[in-house]
């Protein structure tokens, strides 16, 4: 399975912060925002990843993440010339995806919860159809909303409905079989001129192959699209890390625990950061 992080867009809701830098490069407490969705793919066991950015930000992402070897993975890059919809990621990434299934995660979504790794690997193991991750919200009219039956099969999906049929929002994490590329090519732009991910998901629903994985009690799904939510996400990460003495979205740790980095490589990466808490945390891992 391949992984795609969509890290384009203009981030206008975060102006003036994002006038000179991509939203997905902003810090969320102690690490860049893009570390969080990248960690999701790595926890799912995905090692071949495409990062799609706005043209003006591509070099900055390459400078931060390189070819992925520091994290035991392979990272490629592509650009989205203009924000023409989430589903466009599959058209841009067609050659990268090839004959594989694919997971798409949005570059500004943060997930945290017990047994999340197991949940991700189960979704990644599906060979047919699509899986969306749903989260219960108090204001579903602001989101894509999915309705599902007792077997967790989607029965309806709508984008920002005035009268939601459920209070389960579709998060920015999606697993698809290889048909996603051809389905995306068949989409027509919506009224706002975008290739909508909800329309792509509806094609799987009409095919009877759209599954829903709920993120229930004990899970956190954080959006970082506003000044307030960005601050809240940073506070959440800080609180969890301080209480548990564990790091969220520590890419080096995930790679090391997955057997993708040796002890020697982890120490090599940690030493230049030994004066801050992040580097000290990595060095402590080697002593346990």
Swiss-Prot record:
Ordered alphabetically, the record's keywords are: Magnesium, Metal-binding, Nucleotidyltransferase, Transferase
Write down the SUPFAM superfamilies for this protein, in alphabetical order: Nucleotide-diphospho-sugar transferases (SSF53448)
The annotation note on the cofactor reads:
Binds 1 Mg(2+) ion per subunit.
**Residues that bind Mg(2+), according to the entry?**
108, 223
| Cofactor(s) essential for the protein | Mg(2+)
Q: Name one Pfam family in it.
A: NTP_transferase
Q: Which domain of life is it from?
A: Bacteria
Give the EC number(s) under which this enzyme is classified: 2.7.7.24
Q: Which InterPro entries match?
A: G1P_thy_trans_s, NTP_transferase_dom, Nucleotide-diphossugar_trans
Q: How does it assemble?
A: Homotetramer.
Stated role: Catalyzes the formation of dTDP-glucose, from dTTP and glucose 1-phosphate, as well as its pyrophosphorolysis.
Q: What is this protein called?
A: Glucose-1-phosphate thymidylyltransferase
What organism does the record attribute this protein to?
Answer: Neisseria meningitidis serogroup B (strain ATCC BAA-335 / MC58)
């Amino acid at each position: 399975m391949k992984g795609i992080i969509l890290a384009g867009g203009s981030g206008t809701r975060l102006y003036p912060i994002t006038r000179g830098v991509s939203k997905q490069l902003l810090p969320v407490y102690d690490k860049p925002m893009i570390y969080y969705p990248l960690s999701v793919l790595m926890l799912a066991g995905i090692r071949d990843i495409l990062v799609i950015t706005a043209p003006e930000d591509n070099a900055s992402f390459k400078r931060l993440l390189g070819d992925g070897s520091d994290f035991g993975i392979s990272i490629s890059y592509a650009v989205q010339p203009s924000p023409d919809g989430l589903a466009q990621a599959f058209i841009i990434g067609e050659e990268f995806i090839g004959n594989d299934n694919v997971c798409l995660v949005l570059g500004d979504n943060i997930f945290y919860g017990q047994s999340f790794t197991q949940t991700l690997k189960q979704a990644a193991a599906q060979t047919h159809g699509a899986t969306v991750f749903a989260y219960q919200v108090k204001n579903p009219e602001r989101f894509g909303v999915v309705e599902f039956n007792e077997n967790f099969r989607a029965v309806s999906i709508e984008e920002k409905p005035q009268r939601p049929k459920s209070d389960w929002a579709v998060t920015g994490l999606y697993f698809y079989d290889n048909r996603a590329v051809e389905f995306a090519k068949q989409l027509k732009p919506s009224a706002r001129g975008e290739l909508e991910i909800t329309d792509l998901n509806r094609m799987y629903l009409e095919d009877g192959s759209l599954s829903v994985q709920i993120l229930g009690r004990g899970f956190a799904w954080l959006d970082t699209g506003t000044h307030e939510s960005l601050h809240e996400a940073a506070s959440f990460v800080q609180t969890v890390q301080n209480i548990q003495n564990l790091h969220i979205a520590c890419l080096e740790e995930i790679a090391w625990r997955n057997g993708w980095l040796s002890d020697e490589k982890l120490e090599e990466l940690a030493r230049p950061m030994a004066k801050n808490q992040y580097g000290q945390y990595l060095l402590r891992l080697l002593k346990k």
